[in-house]
């Protein structure tokens, strides 16, 4: 297995099959084109998911020893996400 520091140093530095870029670009698009009706590239709208954030989430999950991570676009959206994970009346400590 690759050492963690090597993995993190190389995170996002893979050749993009679509563009040929070596370093991860910052994707600023808000919407994404799809090959056809009913087929998706996996990215629909930047606020829900984008290629740049997907690489960040993958790195965070690996760093923490998890399988998934979520990066939100703002602190308020992170708070909203946490509140949606619990039923009304639940008690949790932050």
What are these regions, as identified by a protein language model?
Residues 1-43:
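N-terminal glycine-rich, Lys/His-bearing helix-loop that initiates the first secondary-structure elements
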Residues 31-85:
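Conserved N-terminal alpha-helix of the aminotransferase class I/II PLP-enzyme fold
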Residues 85-94:
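Conserved PLP-anchoring active-site segment centered on the Schiff-base-forming lysine
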